[in-house]
């Protein structure tokens, strides 16, 4: 089969998707890839006469079901076209199937996908190689929030509209949580940094070597509630492998669902690496546990993922080993930018670059 990667570009209102799509086409076409883009289906439907704010329940239901049907049909048709091309292909979806669920009650969503013969796991985990979520400008870059670039946008540029946009942003992230390659792209002081981050994440998916990038890490104490966080329990096991390579299995449980992911990191030089990950089934996961590194213990931790002022954080509370250790890690914050710490986080120590606190080393048997 041809080398085809299908990627969802999603996010809250006014997140920069339109500009990012243009940059993706220009950048990867220049590298020899054929790039297909699938337009945002709800916008097409709105322009065609669909009213997603209607009080007519039957009209709303049929409209949402048709939206999903057309989304999947466009993706499947584009995939068949891509298979006829003798060069590597990237299919970029301006939103994907799970975005539709963000606007529906769980009951209505399950009814629609049941009628169409799908499950949430199939639509979220099996159709796309990666999901890139661009954080809305309503969260951390309010000065750039506008509705002028999309006449179909329903969230106004006032404080009430900004709050609606922030909540929708969180709903979309929640809908995609569980995909093995979900990446949240922060807002940045310089919008170009946000776009470059998108290109970097897609390059990772394509297996293009990338510079080794150190995310900032801190030992912290949580002093208040974290509203709107996505909570999950993680079991992480490292496998035996060749020198210069790190292989891990991760079992992640959230909202009663379990996802298994296999990740490989291979260092090509002191400043360049390739990272690949794939979702696997329970049987393969349990089989591969037989290859567990005997010199390392399994890590168990509870994770809270959240956005604060346009920046994405992961807060890990370790259960074993190192019970009581709480580490806050930034995701995709540019080197020249400052970290916007939430008021409910007290930083005790900056451990960025401290190899003692790499998960791989925390797992070492004492």
Please annotate each region the language model reported:
Residues 20:
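Hydrophobic positions on the alpha1 helix immediately C-terminal to the Walker A/P-loop
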Residues 126, 184, 192-366:
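Phosphate-end processing signature that detects enzymes handling 5′-triphosphorylated RNA
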Residues 65-125:
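Glycine-rich phosphate-binding loop used to anchor ATP phosphates in small-molecule kinases
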Residues 13:
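The conserved Walker
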Residues 25-70:
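Conserved substrate/cofactor phosphate-moiety recognition/catalytic segment
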Residues 9:
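Hydrophobic anchor at the beta1->P-loop junction of P-loop NTPases
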Residues 107-174:
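A glycine- and Lys/Arg-enriched "phosphate-lid" helix/loop adjacent to the NTP-binding pocket
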Residues 17:
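Conserved lysine of the Walker
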């Amino acid at each position: 089969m041809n080398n085809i990667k299908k990627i969802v570009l999603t996010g809250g209102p006014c997140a920069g998707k339109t500009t990012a799509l243009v940059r993706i086409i220009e950048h990867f076409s220049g590298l020899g890839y054929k790039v297909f883009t699938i337009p945002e289906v709800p916008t097409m439907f709105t322009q065609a006469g669909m009213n997603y704010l209607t009080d007519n329940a039957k009209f709303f239901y049929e409209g949402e079901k048709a939206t999903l049907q057309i989304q999947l049909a466009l993706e499947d048709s584009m995939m068949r076209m891509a298979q006829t091309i003798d060069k590597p292909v990237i299919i970029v979806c301006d939103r994907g199937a799970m975005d539709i669920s963000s606007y529906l009650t769980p009951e209505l969503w399950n009814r629609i996908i049941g009628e169409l013969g799908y499950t949430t796991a199939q639509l979220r985990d099996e159709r796309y190689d990666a999901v890139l979520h661009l954080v809305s400008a309503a969260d951390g870059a309010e000065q750039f929030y506008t509705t002028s670039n999309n006449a179909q946008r329903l969230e106004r540029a006032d404080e009430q509209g900004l709050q609606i946009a922030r909540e929708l942003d969180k709903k979309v992230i929640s809908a995609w949580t569980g995909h093995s390659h979900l990446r949240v792209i922060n807002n940045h002081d310089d919008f170009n940094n946000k776009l470059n981050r998108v290109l970097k994440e897609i390059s990772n998916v394509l297996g293009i070597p990338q510079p080794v990038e150190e995310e900032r890490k801190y030992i912290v104490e949580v002093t208040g509630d974290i509203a709107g966080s996505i909570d999950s329990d993680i079991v992480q096991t490292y496998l035996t492998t060749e020198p210069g390579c790190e292989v891990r299995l991760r079992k992640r449980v959230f909202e009663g669902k379990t996802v298994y992911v296999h990740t490989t990191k291979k260092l090509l030089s002191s400043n360049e690496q390739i990272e690949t990950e794939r979702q696997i089934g329970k049987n393969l996961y349990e089989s591969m546990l037989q290859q567990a590194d005997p010199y390392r213990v399994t890590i168990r931790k509870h994770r809270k993922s959240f956005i604060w002022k346009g920046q994405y954080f992961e807060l890990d509370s370790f259960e074993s080993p190192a019970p009581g250790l709480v580490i806050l890690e930034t995701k995709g914050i540019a080197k020249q930018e400052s970290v916007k710490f939430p008021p409910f986080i007290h930083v005790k120590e900056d451990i960025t670059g401290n190899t003692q606190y790499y998960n791989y080393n925390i797992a070492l048997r004492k």
